[in-house]
């Protein structure tokens, strides 16, 4: 994409993410109302997320009616050779339900299976993380980069654990133990996209995830690469299709990867291009 094309796409992405974030904030009262209405709060949150995704699709469609749009709440098969927007209008649904701030809007533009731009918007804190391929990463318009000076013993790591009933859970818990012993503190992630944005901004030093999907990963991949962080798949598939990935400051890679250990290739990879 040319610089002019990227600039236009970035403006559209910003408008779409802000529209979704504003809807999430305005709709929080509907969760509280479930105490009276007896409606399922998770179902209400799902409806709110679908509405936010529809807003994003509408904003994008006005400028790019020819582009594919693939969202968590409305997945479609993305096609090689076509531009596709990957969206998660509510990444961190559990925290949204509880009124916590650890949720975000995630949006990325992928062209020929390569993420070109990514934005992660934290509406609770009004923090907008954005990155354009080859042009760096920003937080609310100011350049950001990953942390490079943290001693390994003081590293702040984050793990996106799978569901409690996942066959991967035992493996991931073992990884948490090794990383906590061999590096520094480890916290459990709720919003994967927001965690990757925080790594890009130097707030944490490493992140890894099992059962990841490209809705969350695409925006984070651009942010991480453009901030100077390393991001890699662990399951021998292209990064955008990976279900298990890790990211960190370059100086931590060797130690971090050794502590994580190998991961088996899973037949249940994220939806592939075709």
Residue ranges of model-derived segments:
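N-terminal subdomain of lithium-sensitive/metallo-dependent phosphomonoesterases centered on the IMPase/IPPase/PAP
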Residues: 1-90, 271-274
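Small-residue (primarily alanine) positions within well-ordered alpha-helices
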Residues: 13, 17-20, 137, 220, ...
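Residue-level signal for inorganic ion chemistry
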Residues: 20, 24-27, 60, 93, ...
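DPxDG-like acidic metal-binding loop motif
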Residues: 79-138
């Amino acid at each position: 994409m040319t610089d002019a094309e990227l600039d236009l796409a970035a403006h559209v992405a910003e408008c779409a993410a802000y529209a979704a974030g504003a809807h999430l904030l305005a709709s929080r009262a509907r969760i509280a109302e479930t105490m009276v209405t007896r409606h399922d709060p998770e179902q209400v949150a799902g409806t709110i997320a679908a509405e936010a995704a529809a807003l994003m699709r509408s904003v994008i469609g006005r400028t790019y009616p020819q582009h594919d749009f693939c969202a968590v709440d409305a997945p479609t098969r993305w096609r090689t050779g076509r531009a596709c927007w990957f969206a998660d209008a509510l990444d961190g649904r559990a925290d949204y339900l509880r009124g916590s701030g650890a949720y975000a809007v995630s949006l990325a533009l992928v062209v020929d299976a390569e993420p070109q731009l990514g934005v992660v918007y934290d509406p609770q804190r009004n923090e907008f993380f954005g990155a354009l391929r080859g042009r760096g990463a920003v937080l609310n318009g100011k350049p950001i980069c990953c942390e490079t000076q943290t001693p390994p013993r003081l590293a702040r790591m984050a793990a996106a654990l799978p569901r409690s009933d996942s066959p991967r859970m035992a493996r991931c818990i073992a990884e948490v133990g090794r990383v906590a012993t061999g590096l520094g503190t480890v916290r459990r992630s709720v919003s994967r996209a927001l965690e990757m944005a925080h790594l890009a901004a130097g707030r944490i030093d490493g992140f890894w995830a099992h059962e990841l999907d490209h809705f969350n990963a695409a925006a984070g991949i651009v942010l991480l690469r453009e901030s100077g962080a390393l991001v890699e798949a662990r399951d021998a598939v292209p990064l955008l299709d990976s279900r298990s990935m890790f990211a960190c400051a370059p100086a931590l890679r060797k130690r971090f990867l050794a502590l994580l250990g190998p991961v088996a290739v899973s037949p249940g990879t994220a939806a592939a291009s075709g």
